[in-house]
UniProtKB/Swiss-Prot annotation:
Keywords: ATP-binding, Kinase, Nucleotide biosynthesis, Nucleotide-binding, Transferase. GO terms for molecular function: ATP binding; dTMP kinase activity. ATP binds at residues 10-17. CDD domains: TMPK. The gene is tmk. It catalyses: dTMP + ATP = dTDP + ADP. PROSITE patterns: THYMIDYLATE_KINASE. Phosphorylation of dTMP to form dTDP in both de novo and salvage pathways of dTTP synthesis. It holds the Pfam family Thymidylate_kin. It comes from the Bacteria. Belongs to the thymidylate kinase family. Its EC number is 2.7.4.9. This is Thymidylate kinase.
Length: 209
C-alpha cells in the first residue's frame, strides 16, 4: 500500500509551518482526510522532549545527546500519530522529519550524515515520506523573519550563530543532491501565495494518483 506521507523542511524562518497550515486547510476544504503535525512534537511525550531540546537554558547540550533526543521524539511521534493516520488512509503533512536531523546534527553539528542516518534507521524503520519539500532561504533572511514575528517564541536553535544556520542550509543542499527523487526544492523568498502554488504543484499529482 502506498501511503501519502509528506514532510516539509527548511532553515529557521523559511515559512514551511505556514504552508503546512495552508495545505491542511486547502485539503480539508476538498474533503481530503488530512493530518498536520510537527517534529519534534505532535504528541505529548514528543512535546516534552521538544521542550528539553529547544529550551534556551540548555546550551550545554551535547550534539550526540541532541541527536538521540530528536530520534526518540521522532520514534514516539511516528508510532503514536503518523503510522496510525497513514494506515487509516489519511494524508499526513509533517513539519520536519528525518532530514532536519541530517542537516542540523549531521552537517551543522558535524556528526556526519551516515551516523545520523544510522541512529534514525533504528527509530523510524522503513517509514519515510514519499515526498519531502525543502524551503530554501538565505539564513540571514530567515532569522530576520523570526525577529519580526513577535508571536514566535525564540528557541535555543534560533540563538545559534549565523554560521551554524549557514551550515544547516549547506546540509540541506547536500541532501538535495543525495536524495533527488524524494527531496524537491522551492524558493521560500517568493510571496507566500506563490510558494503555496509551487508546493501544491508537487503534491497534487501524488494525491490525485
Amino acid at each position: 500500500m502506498s501511503y501519502l506521507f509528506f514532510s516539509f523542511e527548511g532553515p529557521e524562518g523559511a515559512g514551511k509551518t505556514t504552508i503546512v497550515r495552508m495545505l491542511k486547510d486547502y485539503l480539508s476544504e476538498q474533503h481530503v482526510d488530512v493530518v498536520a503535525t510537527r517534529e519534534p512534537g505532535g504528541i505529548d511525550i514528543a512535546e516534552q522532549i521538544r521542550a528539553v531540546i529547544l529550551h534556551p537554558n540548555n546550551e550545554r547540550m551535547d550534539a550526540r545527546t541532541e541527536a538521540l533526543l530528536y530520534a526518540a521524539a521522532r520514534r514516539q511521534h511516528l508510532v503514536e500519530k503518523v503510522i496510525p493516520a497513514l494506515k487509516d488512509g489519511k494524508v499526513v503533512l509533517c513539519d520536519r522529519f528525518i532530514d532536519s536531523s541530517l542537516a542540523y546534527q549531521g552537517v551543522a553539528r558535524g556528526l556526519g550524515i551516515d551516523e545520523i542516518l544510522a541512529i534514525n534507521a533504528f527509530a523510524i524503520e522503513n517509514w519515510m515520506p514519499i515526498l519531502t519539500i525543502y524551503f530554501d532561504i538565505d539564513p540571514s533572511l530567515g532569522l530576520a523573519r523570526i525577529r519580526e514575528n513577535g508571536s514566535r517564541e525564540v528557541n535555543r536553535l534560533d540563538l545559534e550563530e549565523l554560521s551554524f544556520h549557514e551550515q544547516v542550509r549547506k546540509g540541506y543542499m547536500v541532501l538535495l543532491d543525495r536524495f533527488p527523487n524524494r527531496i524537491k526544492k522551492v524558493d521560500a523568498t517568493q510571496p507566500i501565495t506563490k510558494v503555496f502554488e509551487d508546493v501544491w504543484a508537487l503534491i497534487e499529482p501524488l494525491i490525485r494518483k
